[in-house]
C-alpha cells in the first residue's frame, strides 16, 4: 500500500432477515416472546423505528439484494427473474469478501449465479418447516401448497423436490449450513458477508413441541391484553413517543369467541411465538460462532423483517397446528396484535405492512447503550451502506448492460451517531398501494 501503510481490516457483515414478522414481535420491540439474543444485539447496538420494506416478501428481498426499487429490477409483479441490478454478493465479492447466502430467496434466479460464492437454500417463498419434499417413511404426508414442487439450490445444484433427513427443521438446518460455510472459509483470511434469510415466522405455523410448550398459559388472556401490554412496553422503551397513538384495534373481542375458537387461537399464537423464539435461539448460535472466531467487534450485524405480520388465511391438512401435517397461518386477529401499534398487515402500504424492527450491531462503530433512532430509512439504503463500509464500488455496468443508479443512501453516518442526508424522498409501491 502507498507509504507502506498497513492494510485496514475490513469489517465482516451478517444480515439476518425474518419473514412475515410484525413490528412488535421481538422483546426489544415490545413482545412477550423470548428473544434474548436479539435483545442483546439491540442493547449494545442501534434500533430504528422507521425502517421500511415494501410490504411483500419477494420485492423486499429484491430491494435488499440490489439497492433498487422493485420496478427498477423487474421484481414488482411476481417472483421471477431479475431484469436489472447487481446483488450485493457480487459487489462485495469484487471488494475481496467471501460472500455467502443461506435460506429463502424467492426468485427463479439462483443467487450462486449472481455473485455469491456459496448459496444453500430455498428459491421459493414458503415451504413445510419439517419436510419441504416428499413423504418420508413412517411419517405423515407433509402439508404443502404444491406437494413436491419446492425448489432448493446448493450452489449450482438444483434439487426438486428436496426431501431432507428426518431431523430437518428449516430454522435449525439453515443455521447449520451457515455455520458450516463460516467455518469452511476461516482459512481464507477474507472478510465474510453472510446473508441468512430465515422463513420464520411465515406460515405454515410449525415448531418443535418443546418450544411451543414454553408459551403454555401465555396467550389465554386474548388479543387486547397482549396488544396493550406490547404498546405499553414500546412506550416505556422509548420506541414510541408518549403522544403516538395506538391504531384502532381490528381484532375480534376475545369474549365473543367460543371456547373452541379461543383454544384454536391460543395454539396459533403459541406456535408463532415458538417459531420466533427458535429463530432467536439460532441467531444466538451465529453470534456465538462469530464471537468464537474473535470477529464480533468487527462484524456489522443487521436484523430486519421483509414485511409485517400476515393476515392471510391458509388451511391445509388435518394434523394439530404446529405439526408436519398441518399448514395453518396466523390470520387476521393475531396479525393485528403482531403489528402493534400500527394498522393493517403484509401486502398493505400502511405501517403495519411496511415498518420493520431494525437492529444494527457493530461494537467497533455503533454507540452502545441500546440507542434508538427515529430517522426514516428503507431497504434501498442497505446496498449503499455495505458499499460504504466495505470500500467497494458500485459498477456502471453489469453483464453488458448499464445499471440504474442506486436509489438509497448509506446509513453509515447514522451508525456513527450522525444524521443522513437524502436527496430524494422515499417513495415506493406494491400492488395497489403506495407510500411516500
Question: Where do the model's predicted regions map?
Answer:
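Formylglycine-dependent sulfatase
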Residues: 1-436
Amino acid at each position: 500500500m502507498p507509504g507502506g501503510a498497513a492494510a485496514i481490516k475490513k469489517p465482516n457483515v451478517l444480515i439476518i432477515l425474518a419473514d412475515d414478522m410484525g413490528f412488535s414481535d421481538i422483546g426489544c420491540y415490545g413482545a412477550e416472546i423470548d428473544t434474548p439474543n436479539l435483545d442483546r444485539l439491540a442493547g449494545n447496538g442501534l434500533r430504528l423505528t422507521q425502517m421500511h420494506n415494501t410490504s411483500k416478501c419477494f420485492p423486499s428481498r429484491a430491494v435488499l439484494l440490489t439497492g433498487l426499487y422493485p420496478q427498477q429490477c423487474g421484481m414488482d409483479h411476481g417472483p421471477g427473474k431479475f431484469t436489472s441490478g447487481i446483488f450485493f454478493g457480487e459487489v462485495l465479492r469484487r471488494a475481496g469478501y467471501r460472500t455467502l447466502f443461506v435460506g429463502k430467496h424467492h426468485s427463479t434466479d439462483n443467487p450462486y449465479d449472481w455473485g455469491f460464492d456459496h448459496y444453500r437454500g430455498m428459491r421459493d417463498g414458503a415451504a413445510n418447516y419439517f419436510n419441504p419434499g416428499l413423504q418420508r417413511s413412517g411419517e405423515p404426508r407433509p402439508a404443502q401448497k404444491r406437494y413436491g414442487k419446492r425448489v432448493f439450490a446448493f450452489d449450482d445444484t438444483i434439487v426438486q423436490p428436496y426431501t431432507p433427513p428426518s431431523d430437518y427443521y428449516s430454522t435449525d438446518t439453515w443455521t447449520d449450513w451457515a455455520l458450516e460455510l463460516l467455518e469452511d472459509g476461516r482459512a481464507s483470511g477474507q472478510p465474510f458477508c453472510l446473508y441468512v434469510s430465515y422463513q420464520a415466522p411465515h406460515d405454515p405455523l410449525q415448531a418443535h413441541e418443546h418450544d411451543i410448550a414454553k408459551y403454555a398459559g401465555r396467550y389465554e388472556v386474548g388479543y387486547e391484553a397482549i396488544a396493550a401490554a406490547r404498546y405499553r412496553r414500546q412506550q416505556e422503551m422509548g420506541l414510541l413517543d408518549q403522544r403516538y397513538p395506538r391504531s384502532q384495534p381490528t381484532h375480534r373481542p376475545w369474549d365473543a369467541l367460543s371456547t373452541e375458537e379461543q383454544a384454536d387461537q391460543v395454539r396459533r399464537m403459541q406456535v408463532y411465538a415458538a417459531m420466533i423464539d427458535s429463530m432467536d435461539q439460532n441467531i444466538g448460535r451465529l453470534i456465538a460462532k462469530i464471537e468464537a472466531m474473535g470477529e464480533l467487534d468487527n462484524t456489522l450485524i443487521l436484523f430486519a423483517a421483509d414485511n409485517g405480520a400476515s393476515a392471510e388465511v391458509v388451511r391445509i391438512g388435518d394434523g394439530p397446528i404446529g405439526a408436519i401435517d398441518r399448514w395453518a397461518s396466523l390470520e387476521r386477529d393475531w396479525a393485528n396484535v403482531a403489528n402493534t401499534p400500527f394498522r393493517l398487515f403484509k401486502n398493505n402500504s400502511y405501517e403495519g405492512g411496511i415498518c420493520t424492527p431494525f437492529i444494527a450491531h457493530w461494537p467497533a462503530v455503533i454507540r452502545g447503550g441500546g440507542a434508538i433512532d427515529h430517522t426514516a430509512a428503507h431497504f434501498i439504503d442497505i446496498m449503499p451502506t455495505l458499499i460504504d463500509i466495505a470500500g467497494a464500488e458500485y459498477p456502471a455496468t453489469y453483464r453488458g448492460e448499464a445499471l440504474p443508479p442506486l436509489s438509497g443512501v448509506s446509513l453509515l453516518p447514522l451508525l456513527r451517531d450522525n444524521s443522513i442526508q437524502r436527496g430524494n424522498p422515499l417513495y415506493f409501491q406494491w400492488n395497489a398501494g403506495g407510500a411516500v
